[in-house]
Amino acid sequence: MSKAVAVPSLLRRRLIGGLAVAPLLGLPWLGLPTRAQEAPVVIPPPARDLDATGESARAIFAGGCFWGVQGVFQRVRGVLNAVSGYSGGSAETATYELTTRGDTGHAETVEITYDPSQVSYGELLHVFFSVAHNPTQLNYQGPDHGSQYRSTIFVQSAEEEAVVRDYIAQLDATGLFEGPIVTTLEPFEAFYPAEQYHQDFLTLNPTWPYIVVHDLPKIAALESIFPDKFRAEPALVGMLPAS
C-alpha cells in the first residue's frame, strides 16, 4: 500500500534523501553528490544473551531515522510491535519538530515489543548491528546528521547492559567493521511515541525517495542475511491510541 504524505515538517530531511535518488527518477537538477547506500555487514551472533522469560519483552534501539529501523524490526519473526518515537529527552520536547533541532537530548528511537519464546534480545541485537543501521557512524546515519540520529541502545537492566557491552566488544574484536563501533548505552527512562504520520512509514510509502535509497535495501538485506527470521507481512502499528 502506498500513499502520499503531505507533511511540511518532513521536507527538510527527506529532501536530502531525494537528492540521492534523483538520478533514478530522471531529475538531473537534483543530481548533487551524496553518500552511497552502505552494504550490511555479516556478523556473528552474540555469544551471550538474555534468558527467555515472560510472554513479551521490550528492546529500545536508536539507529538513525526511525522509518528504516521500524521497518526492519516489523519484519522480524517474533516481533509483536515496533513503534517509532523519541527517547533521551523530556516529554515536553518529544516532538519531531523539536527533536530535529538536535538539542533536546532525544534520539529517534524504536520501541520493539517481542515474544522471547520466538526471538531473543540477542537476536534483535544481531539484526540491529548488521542490517538496521551502521554502528560506526557517530551522531549521524547516511544523510541524516545530528545527535538525534545517534546509535544508541537504551538499556533497561544490568543484564541487558552486560549483554550489549559484551556484544560490542565481541564485534569490535572481529574487525569486520570499517571502524570502531560508536554505539552508546543510555539508561532507559521513557519512550514517547512519534506522531501518527511517522508510524508504518516504510510500508505505507515504499516509493518515497528517501525510503527507496536508504531503507528498502535494509529490508532486502534482512531477508537475505536472516531468511529464517524474515517475515513478509510486517507487524504494523496501525492507529496509535489517542493521547
Identify the residue ranges that each predicted region occupies:
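Flexible coil/turn and secondary-structure edge motifs
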Residues: 2-243
